Amino acid sequence: MASPREENVYMAKLAEQAERYEEMVEFMEKVVAAADGAEELTVEERNLLSVAYKNVIGARRASWRIISSIEQKEESRGNEDHVASIKEYRSKIESELTSICNGILKLLDSKLIGSAATGDSKVFYLKMKGDYHRYLAEFKTGAERKEAAENTLSAYKAAQDIANAELAPTHPIRLGLALNFSVFYYEILNSPDRACNLAKQAFDEAIAELDTLGEESYKDSTLIMQLLRDNLTLWTSDMQDDGTDEIKEAAPKPDNNE
């Protein structure tokens, strides 16, 4: 008979198939709670947790961007009544975003990062910590934005130190970290030069070792390398003109063999 932990993993997969991501998060939080003390999640479990939260946060991030865009248009037209309604609606989405980010950050700080024993799991969770502080920095303002940006930077830097020491330049988690760290420099810190340098260095280092890639991670690694190159192309053209194309981030997949 399946243990409660195995049952929750199965239910999380079921919820994913049904695209019921809030429930997928709940099942994976139970899996984390069931892991004894310093016991690590399996690679499959941590990927499921990541997919669950990424989908739950992703829907709200998309909503926030749409609402913010409409708000700007209405402001430029001088529709003050509409703007007031939009601001109220945007703040509702922002409170949901804050709650989701705080939920996963609490799990990471209280359990997941501390129980990580291998280089790849440490980088995975520290990258995740950076990602969710970055999502807070996307919509927070003033001192809260500054704090979120500082927390993002320290988490990504800690992850980068371990990744550079323990993971190959072609490792999908190391590449995904470089991708998201460079997006942070570009979008949050408004540092296109640093963003491009980081992305280019990660891409070049991976290219140099491409022939050492095992078959199982070849697809994952080359996909992220393509995203790094896409962003580099976009950012270098943006520095010449003010483009607004979509910036690519690392997306977790349940079948990652990291």
Curated annotation (Swiss-Prot):
A Gene Ontology cellular-component term: cytoplasm
Disulfides per UniProt: none
Pfam family, one: 14-3-3
Entry-linked SUPFAM superfamilies: 14-3-3 protein
Compositional bias segments (type: Basic and acidic residues): 245-258
InterPro entries cross-referenced by the UniProt entry: 14-3-3, 14-3-3_CS, 14-3-3_dom_sf, 14-3-3_domain
Region of interest called Disordered, as start-end residue ranges on this chain: 238-258
GO biological process: protein localization; signal transduction
Family that this chain belongs to: Belongs to the 14-3-3 family.
PANTHER family in UniProt: 14-3-3 PROTEIN (PTHR18860)
Stated name of the protein: 14-3-3-like protein 16R
Organism annotation: Solanum tuberosum (Potato)
